[in-house]
């Protein structure tokens, strides 16, 4: 298949770029799920739900956005791409509005699709205006206690640091509230002008981060069996969103000129080992 051939070629490049990757790193993997965004309109409800649970009380990290549901202004498929759009507007007629002056969308596969281990790839073009905070990430399907339940950030970008892509894991032992989070970064100079493949290879032994087939960070399971250090042996779901402001995204302020801000996504694909 075309995708399988492309994956093999990509992984060969990644293996060359990151010596710790074996050339046959994905032997035995096959595509198990994808969204190619071929049908215009709202995102496919068989694949994506809207996370709006904290609108009334306010979102984490002192963020400024209201996450809307079923609103094409904030999430839609057009021209073969998923568009997530953050806008400068107040939706105060909605019953769960919490006083926010920006709108956006937070799409999740929670309750629909989740995976334990695999190779994850999202092809995206991201916004770069000051105050924007786009993210492609994963949480435990049955998360009740963050960070104990774990978090995998496939891609994060803050608009005041243009082109610097972050890949991070959060656990009880390793997280930003303690200053112990484990992550890496890579500069992608045209991240806001061109599409790139943001990738994670997650196995029982390691979580590896890459962009366009080039690996740049690895978090390894130390084998201790301590879930505070490695909570990554259970199903996780995907999340796509643009946050506005917040402790990190708004560290240098929020410029109204940054909005509307779009993250455009050409595909989301998941491969898993079949043996």
Predicted regions and their residues:
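Bacterial N-terminal signal peptides
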Residues: 8-17
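Bacterial N-terminal signal peptides that target proteins for export
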Residues: 1-7
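GH16 jelly-roll
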Residues: 23-275
């Amino acid at each position: 298949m075309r995708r399988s051939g492309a994956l093999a070629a990509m992984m060969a490049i990644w293996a060359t770029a990151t010596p710790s990757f074996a050339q046959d790193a994905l032997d035995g993997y096959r595509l198990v799920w994808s969204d190619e965004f071929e049908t215009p309109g709202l995102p496919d409800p068989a694949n994506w739900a809207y996370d709006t649970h904290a609108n009334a009380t306010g979102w984490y990290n002192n963020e400024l956005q209201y996450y809307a549901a079923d609103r094409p202004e904030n999430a839609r498929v057009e021209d073969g791409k998923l568009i997530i759009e953050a806008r400068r507007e107040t939706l105060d007629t909605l019953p769960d509005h919490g006083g926010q002056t920006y709108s956006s969308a937070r799409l999740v596969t929670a309750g629909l699709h989740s995976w334990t281990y695999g190779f994850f790839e999202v092809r995206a073009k991201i916004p770069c205006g000051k105050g924007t905070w786009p993210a492609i990430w994963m949480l435990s399907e049955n998360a009740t206690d963050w960070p104990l339940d774990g978090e995998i950030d496939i891609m994060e970008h803050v608009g005041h640091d243009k082109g610097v892509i972050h890949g991070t894991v959060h656990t009880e032992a390793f997280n930003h509230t303690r200053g112990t989070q484990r992550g890496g970064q890579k500069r992608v100079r045209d991240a806001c002008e061109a599409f790139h493949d943001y990738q994670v290879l997650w196995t029982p032994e390691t979580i590896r981060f890459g962009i366009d087939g080039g690996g740049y960070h690895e978090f390894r399971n130390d084998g201790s069996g301590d879930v505070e250090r490695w909570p990554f042996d259970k199903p996780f779901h995907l999340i796509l969103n643009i946050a506005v402001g917040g402790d990190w995204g708004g560290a240098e302020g929020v410029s109204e000129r940054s909005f509307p801000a779009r993250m455009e996504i050409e595909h989301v694909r998941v491969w898993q080992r079949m043996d």
